[in-house]
UniProtKB/Swiss-Prot annotation:
<dbReference type="GO" id="GO:0006433">
    <property type="term" value="P:prolyl-tRNA aminoacylation"/>
</dbReference>
<keyword id="KW-0436">Ligase</keyword>
<keyword id="KW-0067">ATP-binding</keyword>
<keyword id="KW-0030">Aminoacyl-tRNA synthetase</keyword>
<dbReference type="InterPro" id="IPR016061">
    <property type="entry name" value="Pro-tRNA_ligase_II_C"/>
</dbReference>
<dbReference type="InterPro" id="IPR002316">
    <property type="entry name" value="Pro-tRNA-ligase_IIa"/>
</dbReference>
<dbReference type="GO" id="GO:0005737">
    <property type="term" value="C:cytoplasm"/>
</dbReference>
<comment type="subunit">
    <text>Homodimer.</text>
</comment>
<dbReference type="InterPro" id="IPR045864">
    <property type="entry name" value="aa-tRNA-synth_II/BPL/LPL"/>
</dbReference>
<protein>
    <recommendedName>
        <fullName>Proline--tRNA ligase</fullName>
        <ecNumber>6.1.1.15</ecNumber>
    </recommendedName>
</protein>
<comment type="similarity">
    <text>Belongs to the class-II aminoacyl-tRNA synthetase family. ProS type 3 subfamily.</text>
</comment>
<comment type="function">
    <text>Catalyzes the attachment of proline to tRNA(Pro) in a two-step reaction: proline is first activated by ATP to form Pro-AMP and then transferred to the acceptor end of tRNA(Pro).</text>
</comment>
<dbReference type="InterPro" id="IPR033721">
    <property type="entry name" value="ProRS_core_arch_euk"/>
</dbReference>
<keyword id="KW-0963">Cytoplasm</keyword>
<dbReference type="GO" id="GO:0004827">
    <property type="term" value="F:proline-tRNA ligase activity"/>
</dbReference>
<dbReference type="Pfam" id="PF03129">
    <property type="entry name" value="HGTP_anticodon"/>
</dbReference>
<dbReference type="InterPro" id="IPR017449">
    <property type="entry name" value="Pro-tRNA_synth_II"/>
</dbReference>
Amino acid sequence: MLGPPSREKWSSDFPRWFDWVIETAEVYDYGRYPVKGMGVWMPYGFQIRRRVLEVVRGLLDSTGHEEVLFPLLIPEHLLRRESEHIRGFEGEVYWVTHGGREELDVKLALRPTSETSITYMETFWIKSYRQLPKKYYQVVSIFRYETKATRPMIRLREVTTFKEAHTVHESFEDAERQVLEAIEVYKAIFDRLLIPYVISKRPEWDKFAGALYTIAFDTIMPDGRALQIGTVHHLGQSFTRAFDFRIQMRDERLDHPWQTSYGVSDRVVASLIAVHGDDRGLVIPPSVAPIQVVVIPITPGDEEKRGKVLTYTAKAAEALEKAGLRVHVDDREWERPGAKFYYWEAKGVPIRVEIGLREAEQDTLTIARRDTLEKTEVPLGEAGNRIRELMAQIESSMRERAKSFFGERLLRTESLEEARDWVEGRRGIAEIPWCGRESCGLEMEERVNGKVLGTPWPEEPVEEGKRCPLCGRPAVAWIRLAKTY
């Protein structure tokens, strides 16, 4: 029996593997569109993206979020209203300076994020605490002039799948509760997609510009680099004060409300591809697979027998569709069965059904799992239920494999040298004791040649006697470091 597909290329040369798989599986065309840092979602990739967004939208809608759509252009004076915020983005903003041949009186920014534009409109919409909490979200493109090397889906100048949520609250505590809800929503999203993660409170020097604090989700790529896949920000009153946004409070005084914001992006799809793939291509969780079952007829040369196989194929596909499965029949006559197997394995379709003359005569189906390539034969009458059972097994197996890979790439050590070797060797995320001082945190980044991700969230107590390896002071937290994208 064949074993599961190799992951040697996937792990040893991940950047090249990723470029290969998004092209071969017809997910995302990157590098040929004549603007650096911008790619094109191809039809199959767009379907994966849509399925992922259905998960995101479903969880947000079920927790009282309302979808909106704001303009792409933000006037310069709005973007500059919150000074700390614009300082964090100024070097990355795309500016529109002309309309036709005429220079504009006011420069317009291509949205880098929407805190300023949404807060501005909320000043008109929200007047009283009775309207709170208010939770908006939108799925839009954002633009940032990345000066680092761009990577498809991972580091882009146009982020095309930016889900940003923005909420307004009566008090600091209410906003804090919203942060907790947002974290639970994101945990549910990533758990549904079988993507493992750590949750960290970003250090003060790396929090979102204008936020009181930032909580972030990071996963680990096959090459050992950490990838930020989601962030949640407690904005305090920074933006409501900047816009003099006041509402009537319970005690009838006017005061600034409190806000949060949180976002995920194309990186969710990138991590879905990266975490689960292998050397044959994508491995898509059945719950978000655009096609859950591909049916491939293997037709003999004899015309009568060929007709029998094709008739039975149509019957089988109809039965599987009636069972509620997303089914596609690959009846391309110019492709050999082996080429079709390769094609659909690259696309990560969870289940392949093979139908030849034997299956047509015995009223059975030969079923192959994408994750392990194991084959089994089942009667057509039992196929719907059996495939659903197999898809549940596939998801369980994918979850455990991803969890195992992730767990092997977390190191907790008191040795700065061990942490450096771990991070420089791109083996994953290292945790070491930290005194809490920014100077030590920044020096740790230099010494291990990596980036501080933050401290574990929720906060984890540090055992007595642990000390910062740089200054020798008592440790107040574990600090996470890794190579990042």
